Amino acid sequence: MLCVLLLAACSGKKSGSEAYVKVLPDNSLAIVKMDLGKFLDESEILGNTFIKGAAGKGIGSLPENMRPLLQNIYDNPAASGININAPMYLAVANVDPVSMVITMDMDNMEAFENALLTFGMGEIEVIEQDGMKHIVTGEDEVACAYDSDKLIVVVDDRYADIATYTELAGDDMAVNDKRFEKLFEGDDDQAAVYDLGAFGKELVRSGEVEPEFEPYIKMLKGCVMYSAANFEKGYACQNVYVDMPEESREALDKLMKKPTRRHFGYIPANSFAVFNCNLDLTSADKLLESADVKEMLEENGITEDTAKEILKALSGEYTAASWVDGDDVENIQGMVVVDCNDRLVFDMLVSIVNSECDATIVDSDVYALNVNKREQYNYYTYEYETVTKGSDYYLMYKNGVIMLLPENLYNEICATGELKPLADNIKKNRQFDSMGNLMVDFKPARDAALVYMRNDSSSDVKVLFEVLDMLKSFTLDFNLYSYESRLNVNDDSVNSLKYLTDKIISIVVQNGGF
């Protein structure tokens, strides 16, 4: 019953000045805002034919005295008594033991109480205490209370006490804390604020973090992360930003720079996923002062000076890509390209590779990894023989870059012995013009699934194709303290949430749901 009323707690654009948000403590590790009403409005899920049919069956199965009320709440969620123009908030005060509070804005206490008692079928007891009406749960770990301003649910592994949150002083309220200001004033569909420093401190205190990682967790002191998600026409997006001391931000800006895409000429045009970033690892040499890092270097026979040379050599562009080889959807290939201005690092890498596999020299600074070869026992000859399946991978060092790539791509890029851009490279795929650090183009994957369906018409493959058919592309643009992701769908004429909701419900129905 309470779940029904929670779902009816819907959206709005209110600020954080209402009484119901004053129960959120400022020492919260995290506060999440859930705009369920906006979800209902944008998805139009309650108007979906299949959902209405399923809801009708569910309501029809209830006792007769409940049906009119629940149907009324389904048709008009405001009839639940909860303010449909205000978001619901969840604050986490502790992780071990768990302690959290959920609060919603009360619009009509009489309507809420009527719904509560009707669905409770005489089994719910309500008592008045300290100016609020308390729902008797029979559990020490869960408490629920309401008045004309708010509905509060408290969950605490030790003892759930409503008064802990209703008697907060002004300075102890999150609504008066600048860390949470954007959360209360913003109009995002869904949003959350995480105090990373407090989270880290709590994890250390509870013993969830191994001692050797404590110094890194302590580096989060003063860092607060804000996350927001929104659904727009044609796409859904999420933005995350970590507010941190200026000194820390400047250090991270030095470590990660804007990518130049200088390796894109080597990436096949039919790639469905490409990753690209630009790192200046010399700015991370302070990590070498860590006792744990020093111990790791000593175990591998690497001096601190050599480690600094490695960081310097590997500073630059990093690019990786994946694609389907022809029509063989089970043969997904990939490549990695890394800037390296010192062949010493390549020699070290070759040494590591040789310890793991039987690499052979193909050309100067080119090694075949022989990953497509394996020993197989021949029952006719009673001997083991080498069997080759699929494409081998090559590891090479040329023109200041290290490349790991399939044999067939190597033959095209290095046909003359020197690096040569592909005639059909990713720059010709306009989808990737808008990419930041990562992009996934779902069309090649969708085409591959379509080919696969010719040989396998099982429901699982059909579902995979239907899911891929909803999506156009995914992009991710990030640095070390913020990122923006965007999921583009194949219809930009409607809100992406409605589009995805309708499609997913349709897939469920086709596979026997509802």
State what each model feature region is.
Residues 10-138, 174-225, 234-333, 344-358, ...:
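Structural boundary/hinge residues at secondary-structure and domain interfaces
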Residues 1-8:
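Sec-dependent bacterial lipoprotein signal peptides
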Residues 106-147, 343-398, 433-452:
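Short Gly/Thr-rich strand-loop-strand
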Residues 434-514:
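Extended terminal
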Residues 134-206, 387-470:
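A conserved glycine-rich beta-strand in the N-terminal activation segment of trypsin-fold
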Residues 96-97, 107, 129-131, 144-153, ...:
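Short, solvent-exposed coil/turn segments at beta-strand boundaries
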Residues 308-319, 323-330, 341, 358, ...:
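Extended, amphipathic alpha-helical scaffolds
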